[in-house]
């Protein structure tokens, strides 16, 4: 094809030469090593500052009724706080619950 019939000759004096004003015809970052890694790192940081609220006084001292106790070994559980389900399970297993309070 001769040069005079090529598309580039027809697009002379057109501002963006058929590649659009907004998107622009830019070189691809994919062939440039680690170029474009920034957005991947940005998505990693999305929940960087998210932190659930936890009551520190209940963190180590709250007993929840999620597990199970051995039936033949009685246990004495000492804690500041005990849930209703856990207290019920402990007493059914023949164990005891002792509520203790710490003064700060």
Swiss-Prot record:
InterPro entries: Ribosomal_uL15/eL18_sf. Keywords: Ribonucleoprotein, Ribosomal protein. The keyword Ribonucleoprotein applies. One of its GO terms (molecular function) is structural constituent of ribosome. GO terms for cellular component: cytosolic large ribosomal subunit. Belongs to the universal ribosomal protein uL15 family. This is Large ribosomal subunit protein uL15z. It comes from Arabidopsis thaliana.
């Amino acid at each position: 094809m001769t040069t005079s019939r090529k598309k580039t000759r027809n697009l002379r004096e057109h501002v963006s030469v058929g590649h659009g004003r907004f998107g622009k015809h830019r070189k691809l970052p994919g062939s440039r090593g680690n170029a474009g890694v920034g957005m991947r790192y940005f998505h990693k940081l999305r929940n960087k500052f998210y932190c659930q609220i936890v009551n520190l006084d209940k963190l180590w001292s709250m007993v929840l009724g999620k597990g199970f106790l051995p039936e033949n070994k009685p246990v004495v559980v000492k804690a500041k706080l005990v849930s209703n389900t856990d207290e019920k399970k402990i007493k059914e297993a023949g164990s005891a619950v002792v509520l203790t309070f710490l003064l700060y």
